[in-house]
C-alpha cells in the first residue's frame, strides 16, 4: 500500500461531496486516524517505487477535496482491525477444544490458562502446533504478545491445586469463550520503533492542524515535509523481507549453536568423568605400589632377622664386576649347629638374588638350557590336579628323573617318613592337609630334602609364609617347561643322585653294623627286609630311557643293579631315622612345632629361597 492508494481512496470517499470548507477538517481527521491506527503497516508498505510516485503523492495531497461533515465514515474505518497473530489463535483453539486437559487448560475463573506439565507440553504440544523447540522459547513468545506469568509465593505454590510446577499466564483480552478479544492481542512494539511512531504521530497531528487549512499558505510545504518524514522512517517491502530472512537464518544458526553447545557440554562431562576415573586409578595404583614397597621392605627385614644378608646394589660403577658372567649373586650364611641354641634345627640357607644382567649376557633360562642334568634323581610330586600331574611327570621323565606321585599333604608326610627323595615338588592347596603345613611337619624330621612350593599365590605375605614353613623355593603357577628345568638345575646340578651315593663300608663299628642289614654288604644282593621297606611301584614311577638310544643287555643289568642299590640305600637311611620319626609322629597334628631333633645339614644342598621369575609361555601348566 502506497500514498497514491491512500489518496485515491480519499478522493473516492469525497468524490460525491460538496466543496464545503467544513469537509476539509473531516478529511484531514479521517486521514490522520487511518495513519495513526495502521501506522505499523504503513511503515512497511509506504515506500514509493520511484520519483514519479513522489510527485503523484504531492499532487494528490494538494488536490484533496474535503467532504462535509460525515463523521460516521471515520468511525467505521477506525473500527476495522487487522487479524491477530496465528500463534495466539492456535493456543486459543487448543484451550477451547480441550485437546490436552492433562497438560494445559483454563483456570476456574476463565481469565487465565495454566500449563500443568511443562515436560509433556514440550514433547506433545510444541512439536505438533508451534514452531518452538523448548518451553522457554514458548514463554518468550507469550511475552511478546503481552502475556504475563501469574506470580505466586512459596506458600501459594504449595497450596495450588494445579501443582507446584505449574505455570499460569494471563492477558486481559485472552479469556475463555471470548474469541473476539483475540483481535485486540498484538505484538508489543519495540522501544526504538515506538519513538519513530511518536515522531510520525506528531507530524500527522501537525498535518491535521496546519497542513489542511486552506487559509495557511505554507500548507503544501508542510505536506511535503510530513511525507518526507514518513518516508524516511519506513523501509521497502523487499528490504523488510530480506531483513526477515536474515533474522530467520540467524535464529536457525543460533538454535544450531545451542544444540552444538549442549552436545559439547555432554562430551565435556564425559571427558571429565573419564579424567576423574583415570585420576582415581592412578591414586589407587600409587597406593598399591606403596603397599608393595612396604611389603618388600618387610620381606627384606624378615630375611635380615633370620640371618640372611640382602646385598645392596649401588650405581653402575659399584656393581659386582663379575655380573656379566654370573647370572646371580649368592650369599650363603651357615649357622652353627649348637645344641644350646634356642632353635633346635639349623640348616644351611643360601639366598640367590639376581644381578642386573648386561645386554650381552645370556638370560637365566638360556644358561639353564645349556646345563645338562644328571639322570637318576628321584622326585616326589605332591599334586591333586590330574592335568598338572600328567604334564609335570612328563617333563620330569624327559629330564631323566623318576617320579612318585601323592595327592595330599598327609600322604606326603607318610611317604617322606618312609623313603628319601632328591627333590619334592609340593602343591599348596590340597585336600586333607595343605602343602605349607605338611612342609613344616616334614622339617621336624627332615631338613635335607629340598621342597619346592607350586602355587599361584605369589603375594609377598604368602611367599614369606611359605619360606617360614620350611620351603626352599617357589615355582609359580602357571609355569613352563623351562621354569621347571631351571628349578631342577638350581637344586640338583651339584648333587649326586641318592641311588649313586656310596653305601657305608662293611667294616663299620658294631653299633652301626647292628643297625645295618648284613645283606647290604654285597651291592648286588637284596635283603627281604630291605625290600619290604622299599616304595611300591607307582604307575607314575618309571625309569627314564633316552629316546633313540640303543641299550644292550649288559646296560640293562647295570641299570637294574643301580636301581636296587638306590632302593637298599633308601631302606638303610630310613631305618636309622625310624626312632626319631616315631617321636615326631605324635606332633603331626600341630603345625610349626619345634622338635629337638638335630639333623646334620647336607653339604651339597643349595637351598635358595627366591621369588618366582617364571614367564607365561607356551606349554603352560594351569
UniProtKB/Swiss-Prot annotation:
It is found in: Nucleus. One of its GO terms (molecular function) is sequence-specific DNA binding. The modification 4-aspartylphosphate is found at residue 427. GO terms for biological process: cellular response to oxidative stress; regulation of cell size; regulation of endoplasmic reticulum unfolded protein response; regulation of transcription by RNA polymerase II; response to singlet oxygen; transcription elongation by RNA polymerase II. Residues 240-260 form a coiled coil. It comes from the Eukaryota. The gene is SKN7. Residues 13-27, 512-527, 555-578 have a biased composition (Low complexity). Residues 212-303 are annotated as: Hydrophobic repeat HR-A/B. Belongs to the SKN7 family. Homotrimer. Gene3D superfamilies: 3.40.50.2300, Winged helix-like DNA-binding domain superfamily/Winged helix DNA-binding domain. Transcription factor that is part of a SLN1-YPD1-SKN7 two-component regulatory system, which controls gene expression in response to changes in the osmolarity of the extracellular environment. Under low osmotic conditions, phosphorylated and activated by the phosphorelay intermediate protein YPD1. Also activated in response to oxidative stress, independent on the two-component regulatory system. Regulates heat shock genes in response to oxidative stress and genes involved in cell wall integrity in response to osmotic changes. Residues 1-12, 537-554, 600-622 have a biased composition (Polar residues). InterPro entries: CheY-like_superfamily, HSF_DNA-bd, Sig_transdc_resp-reg_receiver, Sig_transdc_resp-reg_Skn7, WH-like_DNA-bd_sf, WH_DNA-bd_sf. This is Transcription factor SKN7. Residues 84-190 are annotated as: DNA-binding domain. The lineage of its organism: Eukaryota, Fungi, Dikarya, Ascomycota, Saccharomycotina. The phosphorelay mechanism involves the sequential transfer of a phosphate group from 'His-576' (H1) to 'Asp-1144' (D1) of SLN1, then to 'His-64' (H2) of YPD1 and finally to Asp-427 (D2) of SKN7. Present with 2570 molecules/cell in log phase SD medium. It comes from Saccharomyces cerevisiae (strain ATCC 204508 / S288c). Keywords: Coiled coil, DNA-binding, Nucleus, Phosphoprotein, Transcription, Transcription regulation, Two-component regulatory system. Residues 1-29, 501-579, 599-622 are annotated as: Disordered. GO terms for cellular component: cytosol; nucleus. Residues 378-492 form the Response regulatory domain. PROSITE patterns: HSF_DOMAIN, RESPONSE_REGULATORY. Homotrimerization occurs through formation of a three-stranded coiled-coil structure generated by intermolecular interactions between HR-A/B regions allowing DNA-binding activity.
Amino acid at each position: 500500500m502506497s500514498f497514491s492508494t491512500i489518496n485515491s481512496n480519499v478522493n473516492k470517499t469525497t468524490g460525491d461531496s460538496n466543496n464545503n470548507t467544513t469537509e476539509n477538517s473531516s478529511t484531514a481527521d479521517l486521514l490522520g486516524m487511518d495513519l495513526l491506527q495502521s501506522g505499523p503497516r504503513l511503515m512497511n508498505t509506504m515506500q514509493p517505487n520511484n520519483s514519479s510516485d513522489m510527485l503523484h503523492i504531492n499532487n494528490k495531497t494538494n488536490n484533496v477535496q474535503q467532504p462535509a461533515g460525515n463523521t460516521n465514515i471515520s468511525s467505521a474505518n477506525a473500527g476495522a482491525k487487522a487479524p491477530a497473530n496465528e500463534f495466539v489463535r492456535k493456543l486459543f483453539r487448543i484451550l477451547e477444544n480441550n485437546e490436552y486437559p492433562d497438560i494445559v487448560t483454563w483456570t476456574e475463573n476463565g481469565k487465565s490458562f495454566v500449563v500443568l506439565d511443562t515436560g509433556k507440553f514440550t514433547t506433545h504440544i510444541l512439536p505438533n502446533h508451534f514452531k518452538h523447540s523448548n518451553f522457554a522459547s514458548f514463554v518468550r513468545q507469550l511475552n511478546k504478545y503481552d502475556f504475563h506469568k501469574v506470580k505466586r509465593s512459596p506458600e501459594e505454590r504449595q497450596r495450588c491445586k494445579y501443582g507446584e510446577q505449574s505455570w499460569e499466564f494471563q492477558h486481559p483480552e485472552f479469556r475463555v469463550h471470548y474469541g473476539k478479544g483475540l483481535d485486540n492481542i498484538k505484538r508489543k512494539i519495540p522501544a526504538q520503533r515506538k519513538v519513530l511512531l511518536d515522531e510520525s504521530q506528531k507530524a500527522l497531528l501537525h498535518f491535521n492542524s496546519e497542513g489542511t487549512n486552506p487559509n495557511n499558505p505554507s500548507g503544501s510545504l508542510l505536506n511535503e515535509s510530513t511525507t518526507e518524514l514518513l518516508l524516511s522512517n519506513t523501509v521497502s517491502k523487499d528490504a523488510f523481507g530480506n531483513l526477515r530472512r536474515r533474522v530467520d537464518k540467524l535464529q536457525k544458526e543460533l538454535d544450531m549453536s545451542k544444540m552444538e553447545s549442549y552436545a559439547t557440554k555432554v562430551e565435556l562431562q564425559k571427558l571429565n568423568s573419564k579424567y576423574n576415573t583415570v585420576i582415581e586409578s592412578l591414586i589407587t595404583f600409587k597406593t598399591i605400589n606403596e603397599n608393595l614397597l612396604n611389603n618388600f621392605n618387610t620381606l627384606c627385614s624378615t630375611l635380615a632377622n633370620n640371618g640372611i644378608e640382602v646385598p645392596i646394589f649401588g650405581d653402575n660403577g659399584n656393581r659386582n664386576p663379575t655380573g656379566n658372567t654370573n647370572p646371580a649373586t649368592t650369599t650363603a650364611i651357615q649357622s652353627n649347629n649348637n645344641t644350646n641354641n634356642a632353635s633346635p634345627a639349623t640348616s644351611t640357607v643360601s639366598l640367590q638374588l639376581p644381578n642386573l644382567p648386561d645386554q650381552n649376557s645370556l638370560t637365566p633360562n638360556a644358561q639353564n638350557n645349556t646345563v645338562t642334568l644328571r639322570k637318576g634323581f628321584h622326585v616326589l610330586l605332591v599334586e591333586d590336579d590330574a592335568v598338572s600331574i600328567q604334564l609335570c611327570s612328563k617333563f620330569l621323565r624327559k629330564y631323566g628323573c623318576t617320579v612318585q606321585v601323592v595327592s595330599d599333604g598327609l600322604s606326603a608326610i607318610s611317604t617322606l617318613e618312609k623313603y628319601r627323595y632328591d627333590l619334592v615338588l609340593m602343591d599348596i592347596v590340597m585336600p586333607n592337609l595343605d602343602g605349607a603345613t605338611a612342609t613344616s611337619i616334614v622339617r621336624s624330621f627332615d631338613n635335607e630334602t629340598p621342597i619346592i612350593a607350586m602355587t599361584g599365590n605369589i603375594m609377598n605375605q604368602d611367599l614369606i609364609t611359605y619360606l617360614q614353613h620350611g620351603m626352599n623355593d617357589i615355582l609359580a603357577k602357571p609355569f613352563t617347561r623351562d621354569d621347571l628345568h631351571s628349578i631342577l638345575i638350581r637344586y640338583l646340578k651339584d648333587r649326586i643322585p641318592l641311588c649313586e651315593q656310596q653305601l657305608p663300608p662293611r667294616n663299620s663299628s658294631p653299633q652301626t653294623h647292628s643297625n645295618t642289614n648284613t645283606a647290604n654288604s654285597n651291592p648286588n644282593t637284596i635283603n627281604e627286609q630291605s625290600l619290604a621297606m622299599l616304595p611300591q611301584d607307582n604307575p607314575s614311577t618309571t625309569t627314564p630311557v633316552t629316546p633313540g638310544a640303543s641299550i644292550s643287555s649288559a646296560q640293562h643289568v647295570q641299570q637294574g643293579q643301580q636301581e636296587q642299590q638306590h632302593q637298599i640305600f633308601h631302606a638303610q637311611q630310613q631305618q636309622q631315622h625310624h626312632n626319631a620319626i616315631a617321636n615326631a609322629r605324635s606332633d603331626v597334628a600341630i603345625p610349626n612345632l619345634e622338635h629337638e631333633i638335630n639333623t646334620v645339614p647336607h653339604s651339597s644342598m643349595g637351598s635358595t629361597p627366591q621369588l618366582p621369575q617364571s614367564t607365561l609361555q607356551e606349554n603352560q601348566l594351569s
